[in-house]
Amino acid sequence: MRYKWVISLTVVASVCQAADFKIEVNEPRQTIHHFGASDAWSMQFIGLWDNEAEQEKIADWLFSLENDAQGKPKGIGLSIWRFNLGAGSAEQGKKSKINPGTRTECFLTKNGSYDWNKQPGQRKFLQMAKQRGVPYFLAFLNSAPVYFTQNGLATNTGRGGTINLKDDCYDDFARFMATAVKGIEEHDGIHFDYICPVNEPDGHWNWLGPKQEGSPATNREIARLVRETSKAFIKQGLTTKILVDESSDLRCLLATHQTSWERGYQIRTFFSKDSTNTYLGNLPNVPRQMVGHSYWTNTPVPYMREIREQLRDTIAKYGLKFWQTELCIMGNDEEIGGGGGYDFSMKTALYVARVIHHDLVFADAESWSWWRAVGEDYKDGLIRVYTSDRMKSGYAVDSRLMWALGNFSRFIRPGATRYVVSSSAEFDPYGVMCSAYRNADGRWVAVVINYSQSVQPFSLSISDGQKYEWQMYRTSDVSGETLKPVGKTAGKQQLPPRSITTFISD
């Protein structure tokens, strides 16, 4: 009841008076390293299409930093691309017990040799990303290669909550990751800056076998695997950083959630020296940071801020950094009808923009990534693809969701610093939200979300008194407003309803 009272009060305030926002130049926060998305699972198919024009269109939407003749961005300029390093379920076919659309190939073969012709569709998009200037690449795995797993599969099939990896294969799995990363660099010229050996090891779906690749793991199993991976990468002379642990839920980083102590309290488990069995802070290629996913923690809306502030404070306590590496719409996101059925409109775009704002402003996330770059009839893709022949061919349609991410990713570039923004109004997650950044070239960027159904008066200024002319780029449901340049301003504007506007200083 208390939350409802606060919300109603702030909505009234935002309607009745202008929202004055000031960038506080003496209050820098975190460095922003990148914004991204993953190639799972569509790119393995799209990268093999005969229609190269469609591939180029998708790549431009995701990666391009160019503008058209009218000054409108051609794409959203993602700065990190997540590559799903496969486990071999595709070679198993129906015996994999995994849906055809989510199986993956593996570079490692049954006889122990490596086939560098595998995963060609995904590797084509690695090249297309690099050609368009994407500076960072991350490899992630959902399962060990099937030759190393306890059940011979890349899915868990309800076998329990421990890692699906033979006890004598930890070093083999680590060696595979190092060899695959080195091989892709040698064959394709793609350097992986980061690798995540496990993905959502605390997710209860991983225990059941969800008809996609995945494996649970306890904290001790993760620590053992990361130590082996660290040794394998050092032995092969690789500079790739090893990340932990792509948690399925922010609550698992802080405490236990729908699981036991063996999978909870991950921040202190991996980065407190008191955790002698699981401490990873002494490994030279494991950065002091936690990587997690923002699923399940976005409702009720007041809780979204609360859990992220708890995360920020705990991360700071242990001297760490935080990256958010996956999000899509799930069943509990009831405000926009859950994940089923694709949505091209601002309804989903604004909902996700609000989550991005919370992750950057209240959790101090230094990196932010969406889940799938391309999907079908579910709210998990930035781009919607249509196919009638099981992804052998098709065509793609962009969404307001993709362009809304672009309001951040296209303009906030690697190395930017976020700054505190003060306001004359109370924070209102149903009204106007503003976050501000300064790129390495000195230009200011402010991303302003108007979540409300009405026009909102807005004023932007800087605490040092400097005056700027701001170029504005807007995404809304208005036809053609997808990162559209909509003019310049000295700082005072009427924000259209249900819109996102990025302000760039001159």
Where do the protein language model's features map onto the residues?
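Hydrophobic h-region of N-terminal signal peptides that target proteins for export
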Residues: 9-17
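Aromatic/acidic polysaccharide-binding cleft in carbohydrate-active enzymes
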Residues: 321-410, 419-427
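N-terminal catalytic cores of secreted or lumenal carbohydrate-active enzymes
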Residues: 21-192, 205, 212-223, 227, ...
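Noncatalytic carbohydrate-binding groove/subsite architecture in carbohydrate-active enzymes
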Residues: 182, 212-355
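Carbohydrate-binding surface patches
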Residues: 425-468, 498
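Structural recognition of the beta-strand scaffold that forms the well-ordered cores
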Residues: 33-39, 79-85, 136-140, 193-197, ...
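C-terminal beta-strand-rich structural cap/linker in extracellular carbohydrate-active enzymes
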Residues: 484-506
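Solvent-exposed beta-hairpin/edge-strand motifs
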Residues: 463-480
